[in-house]
Amino acid sequence: MSSLTILLQRACLRFALLPVPPLRAPLRPPRRPLGLPRRSAMSSSAASRLSHIVAAAGGAAGESSEPPAAAAAASGLAQEDDDLSSAMMGYRLPPKEIQDIVDAPPLPVLSFSPSKDKILFLKRRALPPLSDLAKPEEKLAGVRIDGYSNTRSRMSFYTGIGIHKLMDDGTLGPEKVVHGYPEGARINFVTWSQDGRHLSFSVRVDEEDNTSGKLRLWIADVESGEARPLFKSPEIYLNAIFDSFVWVNNSTLLVCTIPLSRGAPPQKPSVPSGPKIQSNETSNVVQVRTFQDLLKDEYDADLFDYYATSQLVLASFDGTVKPIGPPAVYTSIDPSPDDKYLMISSIHRPYSYIVPCGRFPKKVELWTVDGEFIRELCDLPLAEDIPIATSSVRKGKRSIYWRPDKPAMLYWVETQDGGDAKVEVSPRDIVYMENAEPINGEQPEILHKLDLRYAGTSWCDESLALVYESWYKTRKTRTWVISPDKKDVSPRILFDRSSEDVYSDPGSPMLRRTAMGTYVIAKVKKQDENTYILLNGMGATPEGNVPFLDLFDINTGSKERIWQSDKEKYYETVVALMSDKTDGELPLEKLKILTSKESKTENTQYYLQIWPEKKQVQITDFPHPYPQLASLYKEMIRYQRKDGVQLTATLYLPPGYDPSQDGPLPCLVWSYPGEFKSKDAAGQVRGSPNEFPGIGATSPLLWLARGFAILSGPTIPIIGEGDEEANDRYVEQLVTSAEAAAEEVVRRGVAHPDKIAVGGHSYGAFMTANLLAHAPHLFCCGIARSGAYNRTLTPFGFQNEDRTLWEATNTYVEMSPFMSANKIKKPILLIHGEQDNNSGTLTMQSDRFFNALKGHGALSRLVILPFESHGYSARESIMHVLWETDRWLQKYCLSGSSKTDSDSVADTENKTVSASGGGAPCEGPEAEGFSSMQRSLL
């Protein structure tokens, strides 16, 4: 089974144009520990510190002696011939001080063995070239497919694998390099066997014409590092459109392969057989969000079947290959904990032209491990009619999983409200369980009834499990304690709180590995007879997060804090439990955990904490990724908007900057609005002042190297208390939040009031355009990346708005900056990927918004990035985005030229620019990813 891995450069996402983190449940389904295979104790994903634990991953300049602001001014537009024709030609590079940070070599990814005695160092390359994105791809049913490799397109990869032994004292042994695969191989889906003696992974090698090679399955001996293909036949390839392969025992894998008899792909008819017809003559109510990359006709459906259909085979180390089951569009293969059964999920026709494949008819079957059919668990119909109201779900059985503390017991949930969150009913969800093969016709057993929406289960044993429920509309969340196999013990509520109230979050239970390779809640043994578990929490406080580990008595609710992060200089978190090699309760005095440690100036490192002395042993020693910014200034600041709501932001200042000597700086404000139900929750502090300032490839923090002050993530709370809809006062609250942020940086003397720029990505781009329309006095210019600007083009809801355009017409219109294009007078830079795959943010949104701006003489510029989707990945694209952004900031923020009459420059500046050299913008096709992420795929 696949082990999870730590993406060490968490910075790449933390500040790289991400929204405000979602509010977490009080005792959310626990963090998945390192080495956790797919058989998890939890049945739903949880927000966590380890959002970068993955199993397949993407992919030095000296300090200036000049003051940062002076250095930036001196460089000015040195990299650019400001003649407009020059600014319209080809891909460009940003200033060297930005290039050096972006081109820094990426850190490896770590993966621990099941027994935690070895560590993989998975090596990565830097940013991919545009040629990788330019490879042909099919956009089918919400999935983007590389037809040559028969996998998801644009899939990142590893370039090498190193193995280190983890010694008892925490030191690492010498590296053993996995070898034997072809030079230049692209490695994906790296997983450990359950005994930790072997690795499995896919290998592909690009052809000479730059087309993708197909994926072959390889295995490697961990002791020797020697790798070899699993299949003797060179004609057997992986089909990794959905699931790829899984260990069923220590010497056998179940593999999704391309059917040997598949033949050539279907050819598109030169003449259509008839018109494209969709019908609703039964008058069904079908409301769907703006999905992308959908099937368009029968040819698309045939092509989807061609690429997505797999033949399952059992492959052993001795070369034996046994096909099992018929070819089908298999989406999930999941062995039971005792390895005797397989739970097989597949999708089938009739397909849909209005929803992605995650809503296609879905069949779940139970097979023996040898491929013999036992019974059908469910066959769900096409789900085009899931209501758009938040917390609405699909009808029928959902979240079907193996119970991790039993050899072969299933559990699932069924809605009682027809999946419609607007229907009032009690109970709303019922959780069931039953044996894989029921005896004498026994019926499924009711495990628990819920009045809110089911949100997951954490299993421990026959006497303990935690069941979670939540309701987004009220932000209410509950955690129940149940005894799964003891009918005489009544369920009870352990926690009942608001998911917005991060200060009261008690943390998540830590998991331990069982002998079956599954993960369950870890029980800890003290001297008494009480039942203790470990709660791992982020420890939100008014001064910032102070993570903790509590020893929690599940019966009395009493707790003892046995570990807590340093508050003064460092930010530390608990990453995983390391002392789980044997079954049963863990003695507290033998506890061993993995922690991370970082500071404002020190990169994240990993440590072992060993009880009873709580000895700390450092495992890694990664260098600072951008030493030229090592002495930057970082501060979490608090301020207040005029209605009394407390706001927070992180202020960054360039190295060497002294406000008393250098004066106010140009400032870039980068943010993303969030919805709240209460003012108190909106004002709570999230994050830590001691976190390492990670800088991703498109992060606004890059402009610290250009002498800018950066106000990162100022809270923009859109509050709707009680029955009030937050978005009915969106513009008002957006403006007052931005006013408070701008006034605060000016009050502190670090930002010049006439040189404050604003920017954002996706919903942050939507925010940026609205601020330039409704608060032009605050900002000199704006940068809006991959946004949606006309909400009438997303009529069945967007973001967290679940009313339709016809139910909230005024709100849709007033929120749309497209409708206020005539009010935008400050310079605005629009950037969008030509192939945006995000729901709602079609490339057309930026194209039409630009035309509206141009039609009113607004100083504007549109950059369409060939082959890029919602986030940008190719080096050429990223460097050009940074060049465009730097040019915009230097010209309209640093120089203050945005005060120029926009009408006088409109005819020259409002040009459409393609990153390839001035081509017309291309409307992005619609896209939506499959509902569940592949194993081991970032």
Swiss-Prot record:
The active site is at residues 762, 836, 870. Keywords: Chloroplast, Hydrolase, Plastid, Protease, Serine protease, Transit peptide. The keyword Cell division does not apply. Its EC number is 3.4.21.-. It is found in: Plastid, Chloroplast stroma. Residues 897-913 have a biased composition (Polar residues). It holds the Pfam family Peptidase_S9. Residues 1-54 form a transit peptide. GO terms for molecular function: serine-type endopeptidase activity. One of its GO terms (biological process) is proteolysis. The keyword Magnesium does not apply. Residues 58-76 have a biased composition (Low complexity). GO terms for cellular component: chloroplast stroma. Residues 58-77, 897-938 are annotated as: Disordered. Serine-type protease active in vitro against the LHCII N-terminal. Cleaves its substrate on the carboxy-side of Glu residues. Belongs to the peptidase S9D family. This is Probable glutamyl endopeptidase, chloroplastic. The lineage of its organism: Eukaryota, Viridiplantae, Streptophyta, Embryophyta, Tracheophyta. The gene is GEP.
